């Protein structure tokens, strides 16, 4: 998995990078390819810390944006949202394959 982290008004520390790497492993299990690109943007908007994530794999794109007081909570919520989107996409894709048999 290729992960690119960008910080706007926030610095992407090693702790944040390691946390994102660890959480991104949950996404990796849904795909059998290594060609997964995860783009993460962390920024500060008002009093909130925003995590924006976008995954592109096999021509598909998934996106999540979450804001909260805690950056780590925003990252967790984004991963949960992305995981739900990917599960829904895979279920829809496999059900269409079975319908065509």
Locations of the language-model features?
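N-terminal, polar/charged subdomain of small-to-medium soluble alpha/beta proteins
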Residues: 1-101
